[in-house]
Amino acid sequence: MSQTNLSRLYTIALIAVFIYGATPVFTKMATATADGITVGALRAIVAAPLALFIILVGRYRVPLRRDAIILVVISGMGGLVLFPVFFSWGVQHTTAGHAAAGTAFGAVMAGVLSALIDRRMPGWPWWIGIATGTLGALLLIWEAVGIEVEGVTWQGDALVFLGMFMGVVGYIAGARLTKQIGSTTVTMWSVLVAAATLLPLIIFYSGAETLTAIDRDGWGAILALGWGSTILAYLLWNRALADGGVGKIGALQLLQPVVGIALALMLLGERITLPLLIATLVILVGV
């Protein structure tokens, strides 16, 4: 691969990592004018028109088989209904920095859940990594419970972790179907499943009063979540993986919590504590 192509590859990957890393900050900005449940629901709904456009242009179809349809539904419900709703709800009650650190624990959850589903017993280095990552997550909860940090609650952190777990369930279901029909097809159809599921929530739970109370910055943050985190970052990241391979590109994901914590400091003025930094480092070491 030429130096020019390599630079282009890393640029695409880093843009995706930046958008993913900024997701907790976008979410925190959105929850300033709407509750977390509404923000999580709107994230999929505003992404739906773009997802539908991509499906129509690319002619992405899901096979009308029972197993394929079930996996798409699980992918959509886990990754694009339950994950954003619980995650956004959690961010409403904690800091973006804590949420950013919590996203790193998703890789640990994915490893454990995959091992359980596949009924395999990994070696001791894997268990050491899992234990280390779990220790980092417990450090985050410990800070929320035991140290007075403005904006941090253990309930918010717990909701973030619950959202990450639901997202991992959706990710694993989608990954199994990806081998058959491709990742873009799975993701775009999952967005439509999620939007159809969440639309009644917006109508009957949020209502017109909540939607009209969202200001311009709030809608900008929600659009960034829907179009950026859900669609654009996904397409860029998978393009980088396809061209460069997991071995060369995958490690860049470790920058996501770093980006999130840095943006929380710069854009939101959040206090970055020593326990938060230590917990993030410990989780990354475990990953």
Q: Where are the regions that the model predicts?
A:
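Membrane-interface helix-cap regions at the ends of transmembrane helices
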Residues: 18, 22-29, 33, 47-65, ...
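Specific transmembrane alpha-helical segments of multi-pass solute transporters/efflux pumps
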Residues: 19-24, 52-103, 139, 226-244
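Cytoplasmic-side transmembrane-helix entry/capping segments in multi-pass membrane proteins
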Residues: 13-14, 66-76, 122-134, 157, ...
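Helix-helix packing/entry segments at the starts of transmembrane helices
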Residues: 40-42, 80, 84, 98-105, ...
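Transmembrane alpha-helical segments that form core, pore/gating elements
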Residues: 51, 110-112, 116, 130, ...
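Glycine-/small-residue-enriched transmembrane alpha-helix faces in small-molecule transporters
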Residues: 1-41, 85, 149-176, 196-198
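Structural signature of hydrophobic alpha-helical transmembrane segments
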Residues: 32-49, 88-107, 153-165, 215-230
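Hydrophobic transmembrane alpha-helices of multi-pass small-molecule transport proteins
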Residues: 51, 73, 105, 122-144, ...
